[in-house]
Curated annotation (Swiss-Prot):
It is an enzyme of class 6 (ligase). Transmembrane segments: none annotated. The keyword Signal does not apply. The lineage of its organism: Bacteria, Bacillati, Bacillota, Clostridia, Eubacteriales. One of its GO terms (molecular function) is ATP binding. One of its GO terms (cellular component) is cytosol. Its main location: cytoplasm. A motif ('KMSKS' region) lies at residues 572-576. The keyword Cytoplasm applies. Belongs to the class-I aminoacyl-tRNA synthetase family. Keywords: Aminoacyl-tRNA synthetase, ATP-binding, Cytoplasm, Ligase, Nucleotide-binding, Protein biosynthesis. ATP binds at residue 575. A motif ('HIGH' region) lies at residues 40-51. This is Leucine--tRNA ligase.
């Protein structure tokens, strides 16, 4: 065992703090670089391996960039509101504020022990009034611009958490938090109009340095599609409804239409004899989430209303059904069905014995879903694809029964939560004035501490008379406060702005400061946030830009996702499986740098993998080996026998490995390919060890090589490297020095090893100068003592020279 361990960690953490090494100065030289890891939720008392895998390697990247001359801003904070703390309070009786702040205290200590260069002076905690005051301000600004509104809507309701869930928080019909089956419930809720920015959210994606998969997920979630909205009239009625379709060329093949169970027309369209069946079906549909209802693997079901609609293009009468695979919140809440040319419609029609009419030629069997010439389409027969669409839309336009339409899958962002532990929505309701925004000077609307937060389906804040009753800011009369709280994603939708100016008590942020520091240059976090946090933050940035507060379009210029660290059994870590890894235990045994380097060397950063105790032991042995080599190097430099001043073969070999390492550690670290970067450092380590075995060493050259070695190692093992840097005789931090410069000339070798073959079989190897001609290489090969002996008495027919690689001799 070497000397490295937590004692060294603590020594350097103290020195860094005392010297203010990691304090950020916006006026310091160097190009600004805003590096941000997604802040953690303090739902547990300790950081887990996943936190470390996000924060440790990203800090190494930030240190690397600092040594490359960047002025790095790397803040840290806590996403402190949310359900887990409230659920923990319900279970234990410990108040969410108390448990959250205690957890934050523990996690701050752990984050400091990591040795990351976080700018703690810029810390934010979203559950504190000095932060959520400004979350409320953001909400009010959206409200002023008409981007926040209230409406009655069917929502996802978790009966266990007793709160509304956004669509993104429902996984396969279950609550992502507690796995309960999600139900549908009609409630008056607050929404943010993210749909106003649908086009820009889509169009600006391609210009971002983000993983393609994440961009594809956002594109799918926004779901822009160009099609046609056609109007169907209900038979013997004044009622009409619209359907949206991207395949208007198949309109003649419509044999039935389907309405969402929640569609307000269903009750008026359902005949008396069908009412019982339709009502029963509606009740069942309420138990399903939107995502579950649209699952491609789930069998589609429906029930007939008893009414008929008229196809606008051919006048045919088609039955009106109710089906839960149609959503009231998507498109018009009504769809036309063309079973001959749509797989879902075909399965539904076959199940319920509904007509199937081919209107497109092609394919050996139905359903045929490609484009083709129209048949059974009257005046449109023979038309193909876009030509057919144009002709049909023209007729619909003439009859005022349809037109071109762009549709989106994206829905407005539901932000109301019927829970306690969140930012109160800054709105009051007055009998005289209606809905009134709380004036900015009255912010924050603070959460009361003494509250009954046991869930019963009502907002806990509604049970606090002190909180509930207030004065109307407009008329001075009695008013009641909004008792829902904001979705925690509202808090995290703008936090990257507050970091820059976190102590500002007059504004959410200083406009000049934010526009100087933003956007975030490198953002690192999990891919699970693709359609929630990452989308919401983009929306809020654009909204604040349009209000004049920001001068940039996107919050995060470059995005990197870390992979997942699994348990030793290869499964996702969980307490119930007993496969969790406690970083503190390993840090205590091996030190923070061994833990950090294991995470970076043991896994491809974007992929992750299964934890291995054997692998972290191997990394500990490697650090011990480095410590021995560096100690031996210092001894050799002090030894008077080492008098060499020339650069000869041994020095050239080490210099080659040195610059090869500089080149590839630089390139790989830049791309977050830490495992291969550390592999190059390991090769450099072996070359150093080999050089130390030389009889006479060039001490000046060795010191240069060691200086570059420690610099290369520093971002990956910051405490250990600072210690070795000091032992080398330096008085300033290694992180105030410049990154080693790669010299391409060092990779041009004076000699190269070649193989010598006879009749295609290798018989010898030899080193030759790299500047020899083919004739000189041939002569050198034939004069090799081993080859001369093997060729004795033989006739040389031909000698083939492959420069820099081999010589093949053909002889008989």
């Amino acid at each position: 065992m070497g000397n490295y361990g937590t004692t060294v960690d603590e020594k350097w953490q103290k020195k860094w703090e005392e010297s203010g090494l990691h304090n950020f100065d916006e006026n310091a030289p160097g190009e600004k670089l805003y590096v941000l890891e997604m802040f953690s939720y303090p739902s547990a008392a300790k950081l887990h391996a996943g936190h470390w895998f996000n924060y440790g390697p990203t800090d190494s990247w930030a240190r690397f960039k600092k040594m490359n001359g960047y002025n790095v801003f790397q803040p840290m904070g806590f996403d402190a509101f949310g359900l887990p703390a409230e659920n923990f309070a319900i279970k234990t009786g410990i108040h969410p504020q108390d448990s959250t702040m205690k957890n934050i205290e523990n996690m701050e200590e752990q984050l400091r022990s990591m040795g990351a260069m976080f700018n703690w002076d810029h810390e934010i905690i979203t559950c504190l009034p000095d932060y959520y005051k400004w979350t409320q301000w953001v909400f009010l600004k959206l409200y002023e611009k008409g981007l926040a509104y209230r409406k009655n809507a069917p929502v996802n309701w978790c009966p266990s958490c007793n709160t509304v869930l956004a669509n993104e928080q429902v996984l396969d019909g279950h609550c992502e938090r507690c796995d309960s089956l999600v139900e549908k419930k009609a409630l008056t809720q607050w929404f943010l109009k993210i749909t106003d920015y649908a086009d820009e959210l889509l169009e600006k994606l391609d210009g971002l340095d983000w993983p393609e998969k994440t961009k594809a997920m956002q594109k799918h979630w926004i779901g822009k599609s160009k099609g046609v909205e056609a109007t169907f009239k209900v038979e013997n009625s004044d009622i009409t409804f619209d359907v949206f379709t991207t395949r208007v060329d198949t309109l003649n093949g419509v044999t039935y239409v389907v309405l969402a169970p929640e569609n307000e027309l269903v009750d008026s369209l359902t005949t008396e004899e069908n009412k019982a069946a339709v009502e029963a079906y509606k009740i069942e549909a309420q138990k399903q989430s939107d995502i579950e209802r649209q699952s491609s693997t789930r069998e589609k079901t429906g029930v007939f209303t008893g009414s008929y609609a008229i196809n606008p293009i051919n006048g045919n009468k088609v039955p009106i059904w109710v089906g839960d695979y149609v959503l009231a919140t998507y498109g018009t809440g009504c769809v036309m069905a063309v079973p001959a040319h749509d797989e879902r419609d075909y399965a539904f029609a076959t199940k319920y014995d509904l007509p199937i009419v081919r209107v497109i030629e092609g394919g050996d069997s139905l359903p045929f879903t490609e484009y083709g010439s129209l048949v059974n389409s009257g005046e449109f027969d023979g038309l193909y694809g876009e030509e057919a669409k144009e002709a049909i839309v023209k007729k619909l336009q003439e009859q005022k029964l349809g037109n071109w339409k762009v549709n989106y899958r994206l829905r407005d962002w539901l932000v109301s939560r019927q829970r306690y532990w969140g930012a109160p929505i800054p709105v009051v309701y007055c009998d005289k004035c209606g809905t009134v925004a709380v004036p900015e000077e009255q912010l924050p609307v603070e959460l009361p501490y003494n509250i009954e937060f046991t869930p019963d389906g009502k907002s806990p804040l509604s049970k606090s008379e002190e909180f509930l009753h207030t004065t109307c800011p407009k008329c001075g009369g009695h008013a009641v406060r909004e008792t829902d709280t904001l979705d925690t994603f509202v808090c995290s939708s703008w936090y990257y702005l507050r970091y820059v100016d976190n102590n500002n008590s007059e504004k959410a942020f200083d406009i000049d400061k934010v526009n100087k520091m933003l956007p975030v240059d490198k953002y690192v976090g999990g891919p699970e946030h693709a359609c929630m946090h990452l989308l919401y933050a983009r929306f809020i940035t654009k909204a604040l830009r349009d209000m004049g507060y920001l001068n940039f379009d996107e919050p995060f210029t470059s995005l990197t996702h870390q992979g997942l660290i699994l348990g030793p059994d290869g499964l996702k870590m969980s307490k119930s499986k007993g496969n969790t890894i406690a970083p503190d235990d390993y840090i205590k045994e091996y030190g923070a740098d061994v833990f950090r380097m294991y995470l970076m060397f043991g896994f491809a950063y974007s992929e992750g993998g299964a934890w291995s105790d054997d692998a972290i032991k191997s990394m500990s042995k490697f650090v011990d080996k480095v410590e021995r080599i560096l100690a031996d190097s210092r001894t050799q430099m002090a030894d008077s026998k080492n008098t060499k001043t020339t650069i000869e073969k041994a020095e050239k070999e080490l210099n080659y490995t040195r610059h090869y390492a500089i080149q590839h550690v630089t390139e790989d670290t830049e791309k977050f390919q830490f495992n291969t970067a550390i592999a190059r450092i390991m090769e450099y380590t072996n070359s150093l060890s080999k050089y130390l075995n030389e009889e006479n060493l060039n001490v000046e050259f060795l010191k240069e090589a060691l200086t570059d070695y420690i610099k290369l190692l520093a971002p990956f093992a910051p405490h250990f490297s600072e210690e070795q840097w000091e032992l080398l005789g330096n008085t300033s931090s290694v992180f105030t020095t410049s990154w080693p410069k790669f010299d391409p000339k060092a990779l041009v070798k004076d000699e190269v090893e070649i193989a010598i073959q006879i009749l295609g079989k290798i018989k010898a190897r030899m080193n030759i100068a790299t500047n020899l001609t083919d004739e000189e290489i041939k002569e050198a090969a034939l004069n090799n003592e081993t080859i001369k002996g093997l060729l004795e008495g033989k006739n040389i027919i031909k000698v083939i020279v492959v420069k820099g690689s081999l010589v093949n001799i053909v002889a008989k």
